[in-house]
Amino acid sequence: MAEVEAAGSGTETGGGSESGNATGSGSGWRRPHGPLQRYYGPSAAEAAEATPDPADINGPHFDPEVFLTKVRSECRLGELLSREATLGREIRALDSDMQTLLYENYNKFISATDTIRKMKVDFRRMEAEMDDLASNMAAISASSARVSAALQDRHRRGAQLAGVQALLRKLQSLVEVPGRLRRWAAPGADPARALHCYARARAVLRHYRHLPSFRAIEDESHSIMAELAQRLRARLRDDTLDPKELTECVEMLLQLEEPPEELCEEFLSQAGARLEAELAALEAELPPSDPSGTASTPPPASDILDFVDRGSSAFVSNLCLLAASYRSLFEGRPGSGDGRLEAFASTLTTRYFELLERRLALERGLGDTSLLVRALDRFHRRLRALLELLPAAGAEAGAALVARAARERVARYLRALQTFFLGCLGDVRQALAAPRPPGKDGPGLPDLLATLSSSVLGQLKAVLAYVQLFTARDVAFASLPYFKGEFCVEAVREGLVVAFVRWLCRTARGFADSPAERGAPAAPPALLLLLARLCLDYEATTISYILTLTDEQFPPEDTGPAVTPGPALCAEARGAAQRLLDHYVQVQGAAVAQMLRKSVETRDWLGTVEPRNVRAVMKRVVEDITAIDVQVGQLFEEGVRRAQSSDSSRRAFSVYSSSRAPGRYAPSYTPSAPMDTHLLSNIQKLFSERIDIFSPVEFNKVSVLTGIIKISLKTLLECVRLRTLGRFGLQQVQVDGHYLQLYLWRFAADERVVQGLLDEVAASAAHRCLDPVPMEHSVVELICERG
């Protein structure tokens, strides 16, 4: 308890010291208690806002008695001893921090005091030196003033003598002007120095012309310069002058005050003659133009880039130099206006453009597109430099020339794509028609289709990459409005991509629409099938991919011309595919029908013997349709079939089918039965679905085979209707029909179509039979199974 009281008294003493600090009393080592309190304790605002707590040892309202009373009442003896030890440690730590803070601040204060004392000593020494410097400057100023006053008269006399000497020099130089002019204006000398000398002396001589001596000097100088002007005019007419020498000659004549309008005319005349000679040199490299176009032109000796380089470095560069010289020589002078330079330059550039057009027309085939783009780029850059000097010298014509060259190259790429596609078709036809060794299969239709499609698409992508060179960022003319909008849309997208796709669809459709020329082989059915699949693939994916790729490489402007929508192209491709597939069905159906027609027309149906086998032509029909099924299945999906009945493979003709008529009614057929049978067949037609023979074919294998079977059986029906049959002829038709039913129903989308057509064949045969006695169904089945 004594230790707690001692700690409490110590704390109270601290509180008293703080109070003493506030009033200015207390011991010296307690003075920093206030700053420590402000540093470690709460801020004034927090202390004002907090509720006064006399038991808070760190608070401003701490009361030792209240604190001790609270501690003694709440804590045990052990806790009191621990609290006393803690307070002792905190007090010692605070004292140590206070002493450290005092020592650090004391050292800084001592260092600052020493620095200030040293600065005072240094400033005293500098003040003494500045006083000495001021006194010395005053003495120097006084001495300088005395010297200037003593030498003022001499300086005035010296200036007068210098002026007289300068005047004498000028007079001497004026007297020497005629001699200098004569020496420098002589032939082969330096006329530029003579002009410079005469220009400096001319104003003085004219000003003092009223003096006889100066008049004589002026007259002699004028005579010398007149002779120089005559020699310069003679030199101006020399055809060997280059543009720089021509400009210097005209400039010297203008300095001699020759008439500007005459010099302007001669300058343009001489410049025009030189430029015409350069154009003639370019034209000499070109073959003579043939208006009829019948004569074959030889290939050019140099490439287009070399031709443009020579034209740009010679003609365009000289024209730019002459235009700049004309502006510097005659700008603002009388007689040089009225657009004379613009008209002069426009005439020459028009002829240069014509020569370049003729050279571009000599580019045969595709050549190197990058070379053409570089040539057009250099031409446009040089032309742009000329147009900065002469805006009216044919800017539109130059841009139009570049645009025409780009369009012509795109048109050639279109023709190249068309030729490439026709070549691929020729390869496909050759692969389809090539004889194959026994036991070795040729390339399948999927492989041929993949090769054809990938080759054409790869060629088209390569063409787009070549055409993209015209819109590259490093090409100067790519910034023209035409190449940002119209070229991308009309020339590339519409003129190349869309035009090629439409041409491809028309070409493919032409195999179905246009009849084969006399003597020319018709398109093989496999080619029709392959082209139909190709057009269908274009409609599904290829067209959208090509258009997307084109729009990415050649982005159209938002306000550009209207473009062909993708769905319209897809509709054309689908229409071509539909026409090709329909034609394929007609061709294959006609081939099978031709076999059936010949087999019916060449047989004696009245005198035929009792059937013992299925005719070979029926087996051939089944084999051909099976082969067609395999062929179509390579390129098209299976398709949807109508639900088949359980006895599809066992059906016979409905008219003579024992499965449909009870056995007890079979003997009722007599020679008078055909009328009843025909009537029964017609009644059945009223309740059956109408069979459309030439309906549009769907893009699947089942629909294609159904169309071929319908054409074949319809042909068989029409041929049977035109023949007269005996009993065995009817039975042979019955056997053949049952055989076809056994094998053809599985190829059709709906077996009822096959059944209905075969029923009509049977009814027609019975109607045309003289003795309609059918064969037993069991015998028919036995013959067909054996066959």
Curated annotation (Swiss-Prot):
Q: Compositional bias (Low complexity) at which positions?
A: 1-10
* Predominant cellular place of this UniProt entry's protein: Golgi
InterPro entries xrefs: Vps51
State if Coiled coil is listed as a keyword. Answer: yes
Q: Where in the cell is it found?
A: Golgi apparatus, trans-Golgi network; Recycling endosome
Q: Which GO terms describe its cellular component?
A: cytosol; EARP complex; GARP complex; Golgi apparatus; membrane; recycling endosome
Q: State the coiled-coil residue ranges.
A: 111-142, 265-287
Tagged with keyword Ubl conjugation:
no
A Gene Ontology biological process in which this protein takes part is: Golgi vesicle transport
Q: Where is the composition biased (Gly residues)?
A: 11-27
Similarity annotation: Belongs to the VPS51 family.
This chain's function reads: Involved in retrograde transport from early and late endosomes to the late Golgi. The GARP complex is required for the maintenance of protein retrieval from endosomes to the TGN, acid hydrolase sorting, lysosome function, endosomal cholesterol traffic and autophagy. Acts as a component of the EARP complex that is involved in endocytic recycling.
Q: How does it assemble?
A: Component of the Golgi-associated retrograde protein (GARP) complex Component of the endosome-associated retrograde protein (EARP) complex.
Question: What is the protein's name according to its record?
Answer: Vacuolar protein sorting-associated protein 51 homolog
